[in-house]
């Protein structure tokens, strides 16, 4: 009550924010006549003028009103579009580094041009990030005309570009790109051996379109680049054979909500019997237990045509948020292989992580970050806590006319489909367009079959028909059109009442660059306008939701497709007690109420109580998912600090400045460690190991000390070691001559990359088992931090000792020139395009790292340190490492 009174008196937080921005909007509007009076050349000349002012010390905030006014005027002349006042507000919010929540149809793409133009004037590069290649190309092509007219360059980053092309695109003033490509380019850059090969510049400013999808939905799964590990796939087939013999609730239990499975005592015994094992929990059998759990999940939680499809003999993931196919992406941790075994397709080998980052940590690298979406306010707390981004709700240009009806709930899915069909027929009869949203491909196909049986003409938009996505969604607002779409397929394309004249013209003439296209558009426009008026008169676009999503935000996005720019519209959700969300939360309670009231199967419940119960369930799921993402960030923050340290170390080596100083620092650390290990300070002489010290010196530096001829004490031993090491260093330096620094550089990079890769394997294994610490009343996160810190200390020492050993022992072969030496030392780079890339809703791909070419330079260097090399660990070495890691724990 008090809150309501205060809100009436002072307005909401968003109202107060808008009032603060209004004076700036007034200043921009006051400049409009002045800008309109300029010639084209005078308006274009404003860009170099602004750039010069920024160089002289003005800030982007100082020139904001003028720059926005210039951009608005240029947009009128080039695009024929003028920014409304609410769009100026949106641009201001984005420039401030916040999230602008703008309703569907309010022109987010046009809004972005204001802060993009302003910040691109700095010359530091602006990234406009969106969810797929189609939107990247569409927006860059459309808005690139405006930026080009104003003298700025525009680039695009999409799948399939070469490194040279990517570098050129990132060098542009403005770059449109997808979130996945951005993240993978960052990881790939940090796997390269020459700074000139890096494609990205330092991260200055990013505007993330559909930021709720990218920064929230996709934040649960990290981006991973991986290569194949040496491991047999036979175990997947073996485990898959026993899964049908295990009975639910007898041998195992399944938790749909958390997607977990666990064996009962009877299940343990059954698996041991079927696999011929004496004890499933013996250390050597733990891997089999893990694969049994993954097999159970594959059979009972992952469904064909819902979570994945089979295409060309491969398992292809279906994105749970957009319903799109994700070719080339794989689930990790053996789950993808378990599904391959289940479906009888070829099982591809597991992968080893080579580089990884989460979107949470990637986007926090930007100096300034902002986002825009139609639905962000429900996740405002998360945006603030994780990204330090405020959400500002931007008012609509015209009042929203859409009517959102109460949910209706049926006992069965069949009864629900019948009711939906009846509603569709009634609306079609009066010419109202209908968009039906489904949660999965399976549901869209089932409803489509039901409508076909009833003779209802319709279009289906899901991952199976994604090629026609923009065309189908753009015409979903035509008179009497019925479109079934999975979830948020077609997001980013407005549904225009009466249809889209450009799309209709393109369908007629094909090429939108031809003169015939412009003529066709002019002919079609009057009929589109007439049809639009007709559709408005019958209520506008009608949205039918066939199931509530786990997130209220996704439901709001579906509703938001209707009622754009003040158009009329309506929405309603049809639910059944068989729906996933209803089944997991509150379904039994509502079913009891229906039975108590003796409600027939084909009669629905429409009550506020039901809607509230569903929204309560959604809030629980949202809270659970937020906890997962927060937990992921807490774990990844440990990895992020380590990644930054290693990438920083790597970059310092690549820059090549004071490379000798770096090597000498490492040399000092290695020698100190040797002395601390074998003759610890303050230790008794009886505890010293002079023999061990000599063995280490022989291995790392190729010399031994004759302790029999000297008075042995801490000072004399230390001096002898330092003297011997210095002598070896000078000898190496003299023998290598002018390119000793390049040799050091290559060896240091070799060691960093090889041991970082192995460290990632250790961390992966640590994550897998750390949750078990909870059974010992220990906090898994604290334990993880401790273990990861220890592992990183070991990594640091190992990198340095390995690199120093090679630098101090490397020898030239006679007549070997500088280039041959450097080529022999340069690590054999895997083709980065052939590695495996996994991203949210996905994981590792089943390509392989190419074998070394026969024409590649042969190694001509000799390492007296013995048979150490830079290959990945084999399976036996991994087992030993796992054993050592467990022993340390």
Curated annotation (Swiss-Prot):
Under catalytic activity, the entry for this protein gives: ATP + H2O + cellular proteinSide 1 = ADP + phosphate + cellular proteinSide 2
* Alphabetized GO MF terms: ATP binding; protein-exporting ATPase activity
Q: Which GO terms describe its cellular component?
A: cell envelope Sec protein transport complex; cytosol; plasma membrane
| Chain positions recorded as ATP binding sites | 87, 105-109, 494
- Keyword annotations from UniProtKB, A to Z: ATP-binding, Cell inner membrane, Cell membrane, Cytoplasm, Membrane, Nucleotide-binding, Protein transport, Translocase, Translocation, Transport
Q: Which SMART domains match?
A: SecA_DEAD, SecA_PP_bind
The kind of enzyme this is, by top-level EC class, is translocase
Major location category of this protein: membrane
Residue ranges of region Disordered?
A: 823-889
Q: A Pfam family matched by this chain, by name?
A: P-loop_SecA
Q: Does the keyword Membrane apply?
A: yes
Known EC number(s)? 7.4.2.8
Q: Where is the composition biased (Basic and acidic residues)?
A: 867-889
Q: Which HAMAP family match?
A: SecA
What the protein does comes down to:
Part of the Sec protein translocase complex. Interacts with the SecYEG preprotein conducting channel. Has a central role in coupling the hydrolysis of ATP to the transfer of proteins into and across the cell membrane, serving as an ATP-driven molecular motor driving the stepwise translocation of polypeptide chains across the membrane.
Question: Could you tell me which NCBIfam families the record lists for this protein?
Answer: PRK12904.1, secA
Please state what the protein is called: Protein translocase subunit SecA
